[in-house]
Amino acid sequence: TNSITIENPPLLELALNANPTSCSNTLDGEVQAIVNGGTGGYIYTWDNNLADQDTHTGLLPGEYCVTVEDANGCQVNDCITVGSPPELIIESITFQEVDCNGNNTGSATVTASGGTGNYDYLWSDSLAQISATAVFLPAGTYTVLITDETGCQVSESVTVTEPDLLEINFDATDALCKDESNGSATAIPVGGTEPYEYNWVTGSTEATANNLAEGDYDVTVTDSRGCQAEANVVIGEPTDAVALTLDQTEQGCFGQSQNEAIALPTGGTGNNYTYQWSDGQDSQTAI
């Protein structure tokens, strides 16, 4: 009688190792399948359509599963997760508008979360500022780059605005007659930030300055942010005062009503004169 001893191959065992990605969205994760036992000639079948090999690099975060089969068809399987640090994100980015057109009083502030450790900041302004808040900014678009302690980065842009340039238009009325003070001027601001304050050279603090004689008048307009504009308006007057010449055009006999007189005005404004005679007549010619 003969006997034979049938020996089992060593137990097929599988262990998985994983290295996390350096950042939440980088392709540098790694998995490794470590196999012991069984009967050589291992075949690796990964669920993620990865190649038949024990180690894979350049991976995104996520779960990776593998089935290992030896030369005898024995199988073992397991899964492992390639981790990552918390995603570095920008929670908010806000700005403070420039106070007056053309100034550099704007600012921008960024708030970030996630990532690893402390953050470094770099703004795209002319000063290349390196804090969470960039100051002394003129109007424009700025980008901030945030880097955490492992080198992960995120960036975002913000546009710092400014009010329109404060300017002054006028609605002016000339003096009606030469050497009179009945002209007026209204300052009409555009741009800046309402409400406005007015300071005329005459001392008036209203939008309209009244009782103006012929001449130049300066006004300063200040908006709600302290921005100022200065401008000048000219009040005119007729070139000449109204002058009147009377002429007798018809002469009748003594005691009769055949006399006729005509008024001949010059100067003033335009040719649309009105007349008032002492006897009540209101035409240019009195009979």
Where are these regions (language model features)?
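Proline- and Ser/Thr-rich low-complexity, intrinsically disordered segments
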Residues: 1-287
